[in-house]
Amino acid sequence: MPPRPRFDRRAPVRELPNINERIKYPQLRVVDSDGKQLGVIDRLKALEIASQRELDLVLVSEKANPPVCRIMDYGKYKFEQEKKAKEARKKSHQTEVKEVKMRYKIDKHDYDVRIGQATKFLKSGDKVKCTVIFRGREIQHSNLAETLLLKMANDLEEQSEVQQKPKREGRNMIMFLSPRKTPLIKKDDG
């Protein structure tokens, strides 16, 4: 048996931001805190201007020629960046797979409840796994379950598209629906 891999127990090396004395470029294009261009300035002169205003010199674009620096309050800038990142994480929605279970002999009201649940899941951007459960000898009627799932897909046609057609999996029959990206346009007959 091969030896177990060893894990590096050292703390990860964090990249320090290029501010003030950490900036190593001799010539910099400097923008002040109001967004006004100060032009291409020597690094020491730019640091002097920043210290006179009691602000920091922050490297904004390293790839430009010459590199672009901005005179600003770095603590405030860092706080704003963290706030933006937090908002972006909050807004990003992880798609989940929600499940709607039923039997092939389902009553009208129960079926309508399952359709309502599936609609709610699809509108919130989640995928839906529709499952028909068989017990005992009911598995002989898998054609009725497939018909039920296809009817469900047809009823949810405006909100969803079939990702996986009905198929048997053990003692169940399943079908996957995913939210429709573009609204379905129905054609008029006549």
Curated annotation (Swiss-Prot):
One of its GO terms (cellular component) is cytosol. Keywords: Cytoplasm, Initiation factor, Protein biosynthesis. Belongs to the IF-3 family. The keyword Cytoplasm applies. It comes from Prochlorococcus marinus (strain AS9601). One of its GO terms (biological process) is ribosome disassembly. Monomer. This is Translation initiation factor IF-3. Pfam families: IF3_C, IF3_N. PANTHER family: TRANSLATION INITIATION FACTOR IF-3, TRANSLATION INITIATION FACTOR IF-3, MITOCHONDRIAL. Its main location: cytoplasm. IF-3 binds to the 30S ribosomal subunit and shifts the equilibrium between 70S ribosomes and their 50S and 30S subunits in favor of the free subunits, thus enhancing the availability of 30S subunits on which protein synthesis initiation begins. It comes from the Bacteria. The keyword Cytoplasm applies. It is found in: Cytoplasm. GO terms for molecular function: ribosome binding; translation initiation factor activity. InterPro entries: T_IF-3_C_sf, T_IF-3_N_sf, Translation_initiation_fac3_CS, Translation_initiation_fac_3, Translation_initiation_fac_3_C, Translation_initiation_fac_3_N. PROSITE patterns: IF3 (PS00938). The lineage of its organism: Bacteria, Bacillati, Cyanobacteriota, Cyanophyceae, Synechococcales.
